Regions:
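Bacterial N-terminal signal peptides that target proteins for export
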Residues: 1-8
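C-terminal motif of bacterial Sec signal peptides marking the signal peptidase cleavage site
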Residues: 14-17
Length: 280
């Protein structure tokens, strides 16, 4: 009987010895929670970037394009030597960086041409509503109002290449479209030469391609745009401010705006950009 009792206690002690202590369990749980909550470098920098945007006078109205670039003190008219038409505006800092990049490209036999620059809310509204109503065909050549009667489906088709008013990076004065509006142009000949130069040198002047190929690294947002380039020294703080302050419910004032919240347009489109454009 005594032998059985001793054997029982030995087994019991062995069981307790194999169990982690309460401190060990708590420590493991704490470590797991810490690991799960560890922010990315970009997320960690968001408060600083957003604060810098606010300190520079940026607001959600600015992000949403509620201003006239022709009357804004931080904007300048693009000289037609560098654009395909009159009346294009960029932020002064962005334009100065572009001019430096233009001259460097020219020395390498590459000619850069601005096709589109700042588009404020009203300008973007005109583009969006023309596509929404079918007055302007979408990229697949269809009349969206007839081909996609469901409002959310129609918005998603237009969003493949065009922004809802209030959500476009073109509102910011930091973004421009160069040379052509098709990816195919940049895949051969002169277009390929331009694109290879830009992917090699644009970062030296502060520029980044926000709409890289969609896939695992960028599952949401607009389709790839090899022509679209963004000036990061200003666009990065504005992106951070958008993440902090811009909400889907603020996206109003145009036909189809009612589906902005269903789609999650801020998270998926305003913030659905190339990760290289989020941190330097």
């Amino acid at each position: 009987m005594k032998t059985k009792r001793i054997s029982f206690y030995i087994i019991l002690l062995a069981v307790f010895a194999c169990q982690p202590s309460g401190n060990q369990v708590q420590g493991a749980n704490a470590q797991q929670e810490t690991s799960e909550k560890t922010p990315t470098a970009y997320e960690a920098s968001l408060p600083t970037l957003a604060d810098s945007a606010i300190a520079r006078g940026f607001t959600t109205d600015y992000i949403m394009g509620h201003f006239d670039p022709a009357k804004h003190p931080d904007f300048t008219l693009v000289d037609t030597r560098y654009a395909d038409r009159q009346g294009l505006y960029l932020r002064k800092d962005t334009y100065e960086a572009f001019l430096r990049m233009y001259e460097a490209a020219k020395k390498d036999g590459v000619s850069l041409l601005i096709r589109s620059a700042t588009r404020n809310f009203d300008y973007q509204k005109g583009i969006w509503e023309s596509k929404w109503a079918g007055a302007l065909a979408i990229e697949n050549g269809k009349d969206a109002s007839k081909a996609y009667p469901n409002p959310q489906e129609r918005a998603l088709k237009i969003l493949e290449y065009s922004s809802m008013p209030g959500t476009s990076r073109h509102h910011w004065g930091t973004d421009m479209d160069l040379n052509a509006f098709t990816n195919e142009y940049f895949e051969k000949g002169e277009g390929l030469k331009i694109y290879e130069w830009m992917t090699t040198h644009a970062a030296e002047y502060g520029f980044c391609q926000p709409y890289s190929p969609k896939g695992e690294a960028r599952p949401y947002g607009y389709n790839e745009e090899k022509w679209h380039w963004s000036y990061l020294p200003v666009a990065q703080p504005l992106t951070a401010l958008a993440k902090e302050k811009l909400k889907d419910g603020m996206i109003t004032g145009f036909k189809g705006a009612e589906v902005a919240e269903e789609i999650g347009v801020v998270e998926k489109y305003v913030l659905g950009v190339n990760s290289d454009c989020l941190s330097q």
